[in-house]
Regions:
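Short, solvent-exposed recognition patches
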Residues: 47-148
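Surface-exposed amphipathic alpha-helical segments
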Residues: 165-199
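Short, well-structured beta-strand
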Residues: 144-178
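Short, aromatic- and cysteine-enriched interfacial helices/patches
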Residues: 25-29, 73, 78, 192
Length: 199
């Protein structure tokens, strides 16, 4: 009888060890990728799915001028097209790039983003700014290469900023770090007033 209980106990220990190993290897739940900043703050990127959607807005567009970009972003390397409400001609936001990072800036309450994030986020805080961040890995292309996309959303003043950086999966650390650098530059740049941009 004692031998039976020893066998049951050994089996239970094996199950616990296997279970702990499975949970530690992230086979269950989401996989988080954490960027630790110089000051000790962290940004947690949660693995999610992304999908495209269409935006149904009546807008007019034009490129931001060099003077407008300098007013909003000082010396950051930005190119962007501004979106204006076609009826009242007020600016809604803009879409463009800061270096190689895609950026969409929307006035709060306006959605200019054609990307749907399917999953959970963990809110991180950097210099008092709350950031929801994540990443997505595509299926392999015909050459067997996967693309990784890191993204983040945060509010600055009266605007919501979405940034996204992509690259091949085996360079995901570089992709993540490039996006983090952009986030930090935008936070350092501070909030800006889109109402100064006229159609």
């Amino acid at each position: 009888n004692r031998q039976k209980w020893v066998s049951v106990a050994a089996c239970f220990v094996l199950v616990v060890v296997i279970g702990v190993g499975v949970f530690q290897s992230n086979l269950f739940g989401t996989k988080n990728d954490i960027a630790t900043l110089d000051g000790g703050e962290t940004i947690t990127f949660v693995k999610n799915d992304l999908s495209q959607s269409s935006i149904n807005l009546n807008v007019t567009t034009r490129p931001l001028s060099n003077a407008e970009i300098e007013m909003l972003f000082a010396d950051l390397p930005v190119t962007a097209d501004a979106y204006f409400d076609a009826d009242n001609h007020n600016i809604l936001g803009f879409e463009g790039k800061i270096s190689d990072t895609r950026m969409v800036v929307s006035k709060q309450g306006v959605n200019l983003l054609d990307t749907i994030i399917d999953g959970n986020t963990i809110t991180s805080s950097v210099d008092g700014v709350d950031i929801d961040a994540g990443y997505f890995v595509t299926k392999s292309n015909s050459q067997g290469i996967k693309t990784v996309i890191y993204y983040a959303t945060f509010d600055m003043g009266e605007n919501t900023i979405y940034v996204e950086y992509s690259g091949v999966e085996n360079e995901s650390e570089t992709v993540k770090n490039n996006l983090v650098d952009t986030i930090l530059k935008l936070i350092e740049n501070g909030a800006f007033d889109l109402s100064q941009i006229q159609e």
